[in-house]
Amino acid sequence: MISDTQIFVALILALFSFVLAIRLGTSLY
């Protein structure tokens, strides 16, 4: 069973990778 802390960490990692991808994408253009 997935705990709340694992969901919280997964959301933070997803948000971090999303922002990082946007910064890399905007820096390329």
Swiss-Prot record:
GO terms for cellular component: chloroplast thylakoid membrane; photosystem I. Keywords: Chloroplast, Membrane, Photosynthesis, Photosystem I, Plastid, Thylakoid, Transmembrane, Transmembrane helix. One of its GO terms (biological process) is photosynthesis. It is a single-pass membrane protein. InterPro entries: PSI_PsaM, PSI_PsaM_sf. SUPFAM superfamilies: Subunit XII of photosystem I reaction centre, PsaM (SSF81548). The chain crosses the membrane at residues 7-26. The keyword Chloroplast applies. It is found in: Plastid, Chloroplast thylakoid membrane. Its main location: plastid. Belongs to the PsaM family. This is Photosystem I reaction center subunit XII. The gene is psaM.
